[in-house]
Amino acid sequence: MNKKISLILILAILLTLIYYPYKPKIAENIKYGVTFSPTYTQTLGLDWKSIYINILDDLKVRNLRIPTYWSTIEPREGEFDYSSVDFMLDEANKRDAKVILVVGMKQPRWPECHIPTWAKILSPQERHNKTLKVVENTVNRYKDHAAVTYWQIENEPLFKFGDHCDKPNA
């Protein structure tokens, strides 16, 4: 029994001596950013445009993720209003900020699925088709915008949670 304990103790000491001096390489040039949601900013009772400008100018944020909530850009079926997205991308571009533009039904910030009121009465298949149309419209509108460096298609699309979300068909 003592031999077993001694062997385990020696092994533990050896492993400690081998791995203790190991220091993982510290990452360099980490790029931090923020997700900015005008909708959430407004729920806090704040002026989203001035807050956005302050984030860009005062905090010097140069990496952003911007949701394009379906309920905001198509409040009525077939009527698109991209004015808020235009503003954010143009202001980001003026400051050489990079933007990940989020498109689709499921996007950052609760309730996850930002479905316009008019689309909630549609069947899941009809809603799916309308979602594809708004994604197509948004991508075509911003595909050449200098501030858009990446696209995020849906946010956690295969997770089954989220208020008013259709079940994923994966």
Which residue ranges define each predicted feature?
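Boundary/entry segment of secreted carbohydrate-active catalytic domains
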Residues: 20-62, 67
